């Protein structure tokens, strides 16, 4: 059975390619505002063995029209909402929350997510609580979160959040990318395989 996926702000398409490889039933629509990034994603998709299941749309997700409801939605939105901005607007759109606010991202996901679908987002750790609260206000509830550290000694710097429409007790996991010796941890390697 085909599952419909949506990658909001796909960039060069890496996450879409990974999902297509992992799920042989997934048909993925990837939406990217930036023309250059969308073109690179188009080329990456065309060169992949999953090209028949990957669609790229050079569009703003706020004006993206679809009749589909999506079984899964993923997004890795811009990270540097409050940091110094570049004079280069392309870099700003790639690195800053300039073209799609986190509130708008939740609203879009809520509107087109299937009733039993899931929405996954990768965020800077300092945005995790805000995003979780905003998603809850809009009817998407945290099911699972994976909090990421560089090493055990570091603070969390990323959160991988999974939402759905059902209220449940969220599951929280923590992962360190590297161990004390600077090697990738087995947990991180296993997570990359998943």
Q: Where does each model-flagged region fall?
A:
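Short, structurally constrained coil/turn elements
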Residues: 50, 136-139, 171
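Hydrophobic alpha-helix-in-membranes signature
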Residues: 76-77, 123
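Conserved Class I SAM-dependent methyltransferase catalytic core
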Residues: 99-156
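Mobile active-site "lid"/loop adjacent to the S-adenosyl-L-methionine
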Residues: 77-104
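Conserved SAM/SAH cofactor-binding pocket of Class I
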Residues: 1-68, 72-75, 81-86
């Amino acid at each position: 059975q085909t599952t419909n996926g949506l990658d909001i702000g796909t960039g060069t398409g890496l996450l879409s390619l990974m999902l297509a490889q992992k799920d042989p039933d997934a048909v993925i629509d990837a939406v990217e505002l930036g023309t250059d990034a969308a073109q690179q994603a188009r080329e990456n998709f065309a060169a992949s063995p999953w090209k028949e299941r990957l669609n790229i749309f050079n569009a703003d997700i706020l004006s993206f029209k679809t009749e589909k409801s999506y079984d899964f939605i993923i997004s890795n939105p811009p990270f540097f909402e409050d940091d110094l901005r570049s004079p280069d607007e392309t870099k700003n759109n790639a690195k800053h929350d300039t073209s799609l606010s986190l509130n708008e991202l939740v609203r879009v996901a809520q509107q087109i997510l299937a009733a039993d679908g899931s929405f996954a987002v990768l965020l800077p750790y300092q945005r995790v609580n805000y995003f979780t609260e905003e998603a809850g206000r809009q009817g998407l509830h945290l099911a699972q979160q994976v909090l990421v550290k560089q090493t055990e000694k570091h603070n969390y710097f990323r959160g991988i959040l999974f939402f759905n429409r059902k209220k449940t007790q969220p599951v929280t996991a923590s992962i360190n990318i590297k161990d004390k010796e600077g090697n990738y941890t087995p947990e991180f390697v296993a997570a990359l395989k998943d």
